[in-house]
UniProtKB/Swiss-Prot annotation:
GO CC terms of this entry: cytosol
Name of protein: Cytoplasmic tRNA 2-thiolation protein 2
Single GO MF annotation: sulfurtransferase activity
Subcellular location(s) of the protein: Cytoplasm
Domain of life of the source: Eukaryota
Keywords: Cytoplasm, tRNA processing
Pathway note: tRNA modification; 5-methoxycarbonylmethyl-2-thiouridine-tRNA biosynthesis
Physiological role: Plays a central role in 2-thiolation of mcm(5)S(2)U at tRNA wobble positions of tRNA(Lys), tRNA(Glu) and tRNA(Gln). May act by forming a heterodimer with ctu1/atpbd3 that ligates sulfur from thiocarboxylated urm1 onto the uridine of tRNAs at wobble position.
Record Gene3D superfamilies: HUPs (3.40.50.620)
Length: 501
């Protein structure tokens, strides 16, 4: 039987790995050329066949799903890493004149500069931005470079799901293709040049107070796991805002198969099991009017590295929050280390996890199948469906009861403080709430936000020392939803139920 802290070093030494000879192997596809790389044990490719295989996989992923329509504006989220830069290269290759199956959408690029959250200096951030600008300019696509500090000037409309009504002019994919082939886009190149010139003037500056506010926000988060989750959420909000402001209906993410395998396991550990289908699937329609697609999800990190190395795809290394951190620094980092080490000895680990994620689907509640869900039915931060309406016999309900009992004294003290200050107002000779000052600027506390969050986002907010460090658009939308819920409770006796005439 297995024992805790048992030494397996002796067994590891006795296990001999079977050497795989790669000398003078022929390409598995053309059977003529000499193989220059081996993706898996039996998959040896020559240079030309590997390029054809790599490009075909990207086109097949888009063609199989048929989510992106001709003449549709698609925003490419590029982080500077190997996977996202490869995605940019594939789009550029697919839009070229020599492409056999030419892509027909209109791309744009967005880069979120999160150096302020990662503790990078201004010079380091500008160096990375200049390197990325050189890559973006060579593509000829319009691009946006947005600092993470911009989240403190976002509107509350970012947290409101848009309508996902289909375009009546493009009722199906076939008709959209026929319309594209009939129309000639004579001014497309001129428009692209003008767009690049305009977007070069995109204001990438930020206010000093926003930089300090961002530092306070991430300083209030106690764990690295919570910091990474918050960074991912804020980055997603910025990308969504850029897409809506510039009429992009699709957003491409460069997440590879290896990255999604790690994300699947780490999200389960973080309590995001109900949102796995949206977080790891090919398309993510949670935002309604903007759909996130992941065309790189069939590529492993090994394939991407080989392709970038052989065909000189430029990329920029930008340190993140978990750079140079140890394996147990966060749940995400620990999961990545676990999957990577397991993949080294068992090459089918990543593919097995990835194939499992393909079978996941989100079941919509019966009341939301015919109509669009209300904003109150979605999480305030990640905009996924709330998974906190569980039965009393569930593990989630038992966790809530345990938490309430452990914090009973603390909650009673906070209630007394709120009750003692409820009649005071910042305006003289007026009661609280009549002038609108206290009611409109009241900062939500942790307990108020929990009712608006999914289980995973509750854990993230729970790790915060001060909730008032969140960006203003989140606090404003939270207060708005709380008011609507309170108003609904007050007039509930006058409302007709759905089963009543």
């Amino acid at each position: 039987m297995c024992q805790v802290e048992e030494d397996y070093n002796g067994l590891e030494c006795n296990q001999e790995k079977i050497p795989v000879s790669g000398l003078n192997r022929k390409c598995m596809k053309c059977k003529e050329g000499t193989a220059v790389l081996i993706i898996r044990v039996s998959d040896a490719f020559c240079r030309s066949c590997f390029k054809e295989y790599f490009i075909h996989k990207f086109r097949a992923m888009l063609g199989k799903n048929r989510v992106i329509f001709p003449q549709e504006k698609v925003l490419l989220a590029v982080s500077g890493g190997a996977a996202s830069c490869t995605m940019l290269s594939q789009v550029q290759e697919g839009l070229s004149r020599d492409a056999p199956k030419k892509l027909r959408f209109m791309p744009g690029i967005v880069y979120i500069d999160d150096g302020g959250a990662c503790g990078r200096s201004e010079d380091e951030r500008q160096t990375s931005i200049s390197q990325l600008k050189n890559i973006f300019t060579q593509t000829g696509f319009p691009y946006f470079i947005v600092p993470l500090e911009k989240v403190f000037s976002l509107p509350t409309s970012v947290l409101v799901p848009g309508t996902s009504d289909p375009d009546p002019s493009n009722p199906c994919y076939k008709q959209a293709v026929d319309k594209y082939l009939k129309e000639k886009q004579k001014l497309r190149e001129e428009e692209a040049v003008c767009a690049v010139a305009q977007l070069n003037l995109e204001d990438s500056a930020y206010l000093p107070e926003h930089k300090l506010a961002l530092q306070r926000l991430f300083s209030s988060l106690k764990t690295l796991s919570a910091k990474q989750e918050m960074l991912q959420t804020l980055r997603q909000h910025l990308i969504l805002h850029v897409a809506r402001e510039n009429s992009y209906s699709k957003v491409m993410m460069g997440e590879s198969c290896s990255r999604l395998a790690v994300k699947l396991l780490s999200n389960i550990a973080l309590g995001r099991g109900a949102a796995l289908a949206s977080d790891t699937g090919f398309s993510d329609p949670r935002f309604g009017d903007v759909v996130i697609v992941r065309p790189m999800r069939d590529y492993s990190s090994k394939e991407i590295t080989f392709y970038n190395r052989m065909f000189h795809v430029p990329s920029v290394f930008i340190p993140g929050l978990d750079t140079k951190s140890h394996d147990k620094a966060s749940i995400q980092r620990l999961t990545e280390s676990f999957v990577t080490n397991l993949q080294a000895d068992f090459p089918s680990t990543v593919s097995t996890i990835y194939r499992t994620s393909e079978k996941l689907h989100t079941v919509r509640p019966p009341q939301s199948q015919s109509t669009e869900p209300e904003p109150a039915s979605k999480c305030l931060l990640c905009l996924c469906a709330l998974d906190t309406t569980a039965d009393k016999a569930s593990a989630f309900h038992a966790t809530l009861i345990s938490e309430q009992l452990s914090q009973l004294r603390l909650q009673e003290g906070s209630v007394d403080l709120v009750a003692g200050s409820s009649d005071q107002c910042c305006v003289e000779d007026q009661t609280c709430g009549t002038s609108g000052c206290c009611s409109s600027k009241r900062t939500p506390v942790q307990q108020d936000l929990k009712t608006l969050l999914c289980y995973s986002c509750r854990l993230t907010v729970k790790d915060m020392a001060a909730v008032n460090t969140l960006p203003p658009y989140i606090l404003t939308e939270a207060e708005k939803r709380q008011r609507r819920s309170q108003m609904k409770v007050e007039i509930s006796e006058y409302l007709l139920e759905e089963d009543q005439d």
